[in-house]
Swiss-Prot record:
Mn(2+) binds at residues 146, 148, 217. Its EC number is 1.1.1.267. Coiled coil: none annotated. GO terms for molecular function: 1-deoxy-D-xylulose-5-phosphate reductoisomerase activity; manganese ion binding; NADPH binding. Belongs to the DXR family. NADPH binds at residues 10-13, 36-38, 120, 122, 201. InterPro entries: DXP_reductoisomerase (IPR003821), DXP_reductoisomerase_C (IPR013644), DXP_reductoisomerase_N (IPR013512), DXPR_C (IPR026877), DXPR_C_sf (IPR036169), NAD(P)-bd_dom_sf (IPR036291). The lineage of its organism: Bacteria, Bacillati, Bacillota, Bacilli, Bacillales. It catalyses: 2-C-methyl-D-erythritol 4-phosphate + NADP(+) = 1-deoxy-D-xylulose 5-phosphate + NADPH + H(+). This is 1-deoxy-D-xylulose 5-phosphate reductoisomerase. 1-deoxy-D-xylulose 5-phosphate binds at residues 121, 147-148, 172, 195, 208, 213-214, 217. Catalyzes the NADPH-dependent rearrangement and reduction of 1-deoxy-D-xylulose-5-phosphate (DXP) to 2-C-methyl-D-erythritol 4-phosphate (MEP). HAMAP family: DXP_reductoisom (MF_00183).
């Protein structure tokens, strides 16, 4: 029986993580979770899983939840997130919160020698050097939950990582993959939220449409697998059947395939190095698929992917700036305060405005994050 702490239980990855726990009650126990502002959902999780701790975002929600939480302790805010991440009984901490708020809980959980199931992209994007140094220092495993990084992780099982020639990350292309840039001037929030292949939260669905999601994954892959940016490619693959590939020195390519279902990489992270049945996921029959399609990525068409490569190669504090600018811009688009292509413009402005710090401390990263958010808000 593995004890799990789950940060971000009410989001897309969080709810599917609970699906995995539900499928294997003899294998996993939820000891703590966070649920942001989603109090009704938190009540349901408490009633079903009887965890010891729940964290919510706002202090005013604590009393509401305490009235129905029974023996479950209710905490709140950033300190509450840390309490969930540092639960003494938790062996695995799944970080599924969205945004840079996931950084500090990850670092503290690593220091407490917890195994990390990492679904929070921003942790590695903003502070990859700090996170990987801490993981090495404390001998902690970072297990990828993203389907693309899980695919690479599985392809590398038993392989000599020094023999890697290239990582090939696949991209569905998002909601607007078939639109021209001219057509993107007129797209709506509702259009952007209709992803052709995956069911995800609103922020990541917009990131998928701008291709920033793939850019964040490139930076993540650089840190997780220690591969230079020049050896990480992105290929457009509309069917989302091949989740990523690894090319080795001898030009052989290993690929991980499967029907699009986030529970597969989530469960693999929780069971690694073992596997468990996942009987209600769709079996992949290639003869039903027929043809798989691949296209070279156009970084002028998808400018956010180019920004991510530039930020990653620049290094230091630049990825944190790009990430903070993107979070503010995406939120403004979701609120219908800016157009879709303005997201790119705001990110570019923030990156051009920033003076890079080569090896920022945690405090500097948090300061840069806050300053960038203020700068972008002033531009809107």
């Amino acid at each position: 029986m593995k004890n799990i702490s789950l940060l971000g239980a009410s989001g897309s990855i969080g709810t599917q993580t609970l699906d995995v726990l539900r499928s294997h009650p003899d294998q996993f126990r939820l000891v703590a979770f966070s649920a942001g502002k989603n109090i009704d959902y938190a009540v349901k999780v408490i009633q079903e899983f009887s965890p010891q701790i729940v964290s919510v975002q706002r202090e005013e929600d604590v009393l509401k939840l305490q009235a129905v939480s029974g023996n479950t302790k209710v905490v709140y805010g950033s300190e509450g997130l840390l309490e969930v991440a540092l639960h003494p009984d938790a062996e695995i901490v799944v970080n599924a919160v969205v945004g840079s708020v996931g950084l500090l809980p990850t670092l503290r959980a690593i220091e407490a020698k917890k195994t990390i199931g990492i679904a929070n992209k921003e942790t590695l994007v903003t502070a990859g050097h700090l996170v990987m140094e801490a993981a090495r220092k404390h001998n902690v495993s970072l297990l990828p939950v993203d389907s693309e990084h899980s695919a690479i992780f599985q392809c590398l099982n038993g392989e000599n990582e020094k023999r890697i020639s290239r990582l090939i990350i696949t991209a569905s292309g998002g909601s607007f993959r078939d639109k021209t840039r001219d057509e993107l001037h007129h797209v709506t929030v509702e259009d952007a939220l209709r992803h052709p292949n995956w069911s995800m939260g609103s922020k990541i669905t917009i990131d998928s449409a701008t291709m920033m999601n793939k850019g964040l994954e490139v930076i993540e892959a650089h840190w997780l697998f220690g591969i230079p940016y020049e050896q990480i490619d992105v290929v457009l693959h509309k069917e989302s059947i091949i989740h990523s590939m690894v090319e080795f020195e001898d030009r052989s390519v290993m690929a991980q395939l499967g029907s699009p279902d986030m529970r597969v990489p989530i469960q693999y992270a929780l069971t690694y190095p073992d596997r468990l049945p996942l009987s209600d996921t769709k079996q992949l029959n290639l003869w039903e698929m027929g043809t798989l399609h691949f296209e070279k990525m156009n970084q002028e068409r998808f400018r956010c992917l180019r920004f991510a490569y530039e930020a990653g190669k620049t290094g230091g504090s630049m990825p944190a700036v790009m990430n903070a600018a993107n979070e503010v811009a995406v939120e403004a688009f979701l609120q219908k305060r800016i157009g879709f292509l303005t997201v790119e413009d705001l990110i570019e402005k923030a990156m051009n405005h920033h003076n890079v710090i080569a090896r920022p401390s945690l405090e500097e990263i948090l300061e840069i994050d806050a300053a960038t958010r203020r700068f972008v808000m002033e531009q809107i």
